Curated annotation (Swiss-Prot):
Protein name: Putative pterin-4-alpha-carbinolamine dehydratase
The entry's keywords: Lyase
Gene3D superfamilies, alphabetized: Transcriptional coactivator/pterin dehydratase (3.30.1360.20)
Regions that span the bilayer: none
Length: 92
């Protein structure tokens, strides 16, 4: 099981991910696209890296907006896995 990060470690990580914010026990980013089709295309691009990491985001879709939430459920909060996957998603 991944080790849960401390608040200090989380803040240090967040400083490297300015588009992400901490919401409760997760990190969240909202992506905005031209239309629904582009939003769905982006969601489909999340599948392969999430499967490869065996770490799956919670995803909300609202027309041209995609909200991605990351947390490590079995650790009860944020771990390095969340920030690693956030970095991968930022590259897409």
């Amino acid at each position: 099981m991944a080790t849960r990060l401390t608040d200090t470690e989380i803040q240090a990580q967040l400083s490297q991910f300015p588009e992400w914010s901490k919401v409760d026990n997760k990190i969240q980013r909202r992506f905005k696209f031209k239309n629904f089709i582009e939003a769905i295309d982006f969601v489909n691009k999340l599948v392969e890296p999430a499967e490869a990491a065996d770490h799956h985001p919670d995803i909300e879709i609202s027309y041209n907006k995609v909200t991605v939430n990351l947390t490590t459920h079995d650790a009860g909060g944020l771990t390095q896995k969340d920030f690693d996957l956030a970095g991968t998603f930022d590259q897409l």
